[in-house]
């Protein structure tokens, strides 16, 4: 029986681990990030992958820094035939990558060489792509740069969010891995080198990227809102207060107005001018210190005026 070590951390990784178990591989160990404090009460919380591994009685390693010798030697001591990673969250050292008989392969949520990095799902939507996918490739020390083994495309729908696409890609990754591993073991795959001229990056989202830039086109603002839903959530400011924007709709704007200006107030939301003739009607938001709500609820208690400028005094 093929001995596998799985390395992963978030919810995205769980279906991949589950599929390895269902397919009958001997998952001899799981490597995941350390437990972290979560929420206002800072409750020490295990990763989703750790929770899944413990359900199946699989030993769990939680290195703070996998590149340290005493940490990676614990992985090597398991003597896996194959290592599978999916959103592990740390750079894996060569000592691990070169050890298994069948190598170390990664399940990545983009069609490499596009969108290397830690936030490929967010960027696929923020960039307005109509499709993305899963790549399974050999791991190297350079970020997501290994030779490609298999790929599958996944359509991005018009109203897709990072949350819904995350779920689709997670399942697609598990399914593709299920088909890839037997072919890899049988020596039936021809690795393909990535074209370095086509490389783009999707680095982790920074706080300053979350703010809506109303000078962009309506389509770009709409994609920005979808791409940051349900985390970390796009935001703007209204009357100097931070407001998270959970959802908006593209609408035509007939009269010219400065980008970021409220040009219409309707029952289910208010329309904001952008950098072109497509405005964005905010329909779901979250004022600072309050719960997420529909814009119609918000408008019952707050009455912004037409001409009010959003995005100032952030």
Swiss-Prot record:
Species of origin: Bacillus anthracis
Supply the name of the protein.
Answer: Methionyl-tRNA formyltransferase
Q: Which HAMAP family match?
A: Formyl_trans
| Known EC number | 2.1.2.9
Keywords on record: Protein biosynthesis, Transferase
Q: Does the keyword Protein biosynthesis apply?
A: yes
Taxonomic superkingdom: Bacteria
Cited PROSITE patterns: GART
Q: Which PANTHER family match?
A: METHIONYL-TRNA FORMYLTRANSFERASE, METHIONYL-TRNA FORMYLTRANSFERASE, MITOCHONDRIAL
Q: Name one GO molecular function term.
A: methionyl-tRNA formyltransferase activity
Where is the organism placed in the taxonomic lineage, from the top? Bacteria, Bacillati, Bacillota, Bacilli, Bacillales
**Residues binding (6S)-5,6,7,8-tetrahydrofolate:** 110-113
Q: Supply the InterPro entries for this chain.
A: Fmt, Formyl_trans_C, Formyl_trans_C_sf, Formyl_transf_N, Formyl_transf_N_sf, Formyl_transferase-like_C_sf, GART_AS, Met-tRNA-FMT_C
Its biological function? Attaches a formyl group to the free amino group of methionyl-tRNA(fMet). The formyl group appears to play a dual role in the initiator identity of N-formylmethionyl-tRNA by promoting its recognition by IF2 and preventing the misappropriation of this tRNA by the elongation apparatus.
